[in-house]
Structures are given as C-alpha cells and as structure tokens.
Amino acid sequence: MRSVAFVHTHTGEKLTAVYWKDGAYQQQVLQQVNHLLRDFRTNEVHDIDPALLDLLFDLRTKVGSDAAFHVISAYRSPQTNEMLRRSSNGVAEHSMHMQGKAIDVRLAGFPTARLAEVARSLRRGGVGYYAASDFVHVDTGRVRYW
C-alpha cells in the first residue's frame, strides 16, 4: 500500500488516502488527488502523474515522516503559469506544473533544506530548493537540480 497526505496551503483542503494497493492505482483516490492539486486560481482540474505520487511517497518514507505535505503549487493552467512568469522569477515557460508532473511542497515538521537534500538523493526527476519561499519543487522529468 502507498498513501498520500496533503494540506493545500491556499485552499485549506486536506486529503489522506491510500492511492495504490493490491498492485494497482486506486482511480477514485487519483480523482480526489487531481481535484485537490488543481489550479486553485482557475479551478481547472488536470490529471496528476501517478509517478509524482510515487516520488512523494518514497520521499516521505525516506525522511521517516507520516506528516502531510503542505502544497504550495501543483497543477497550473497555461494562463496561471503565464501570469506567474510575468510576476515572479524562476517560473519556466514550459513548466512541468502544466503537465501535472510537478509539485511545490514543504513537509510539516521537517526542515525544507533537508527535504531538498533527501529528494536529490532519490535521483528521480527535478528537484529545486527555494530557500526564500521555504519550499521544494519536485517533478517527474529528467534528473536535474537547482
């Protein structure tokens, strides 16, 4: 069994659920995840890559925590991504957030810098540490760090 635990920092929504059991992803739970990780600015829902959930499960397991991930940003519509690109530094034009393959998080009760180190040690996908904003970006793209 693999589970997820999320608290969305912008909407206050929470989800703790088993998303994989008996050798299969649980479609109903994946739909709940898609909804919680939607673009909260536009309310647009998009499929979240199950491999991203697996990455988060492994990250939480490796740090030895059962705390919820605090979600800063997950799926972003193209409109939201463009708005953020114009108003912020470090937002990619072709962000993996627009594909449901990236998430920005912190883990309750765990130092964010250390979370980034552990995420990099998994050697899976991209990992960005944003110290000033106190979050870690992880995605299911090619392995890279910033």
Residue positions per predicted region:
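Intrinsically disordered, low-complexity
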Residues: 1-31, 142
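Catalytic cores and adjacent binding grooves of peptidoglycan-active enzymes
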Residues: 2-7, 87-146
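Active-site acidic/histidine clusters and adjacent loop/turn architecture
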Residues: 21-72
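Short acidic/His/Gly/Ser-rich catalytic and metal-binding motifs that mark active-site loops
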Residues: 26-28, 80-83
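Acidic helix-start/capping segments at beta-turn-to-alpha-helix junctions
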Residues: 68-82
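Short, solvent-exposed loop/turn and secondary-structure capping segments
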Residues: 17-18, 83-85
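Loop/turn elements at helix/coil->beta-strand transitions in domains of secreted/extracellular proteins
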Residues: 13, 65-69, 123-126
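Cysteine-centered nucleophilic/redox motifs
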Residues: 55-60, 77-80, 105
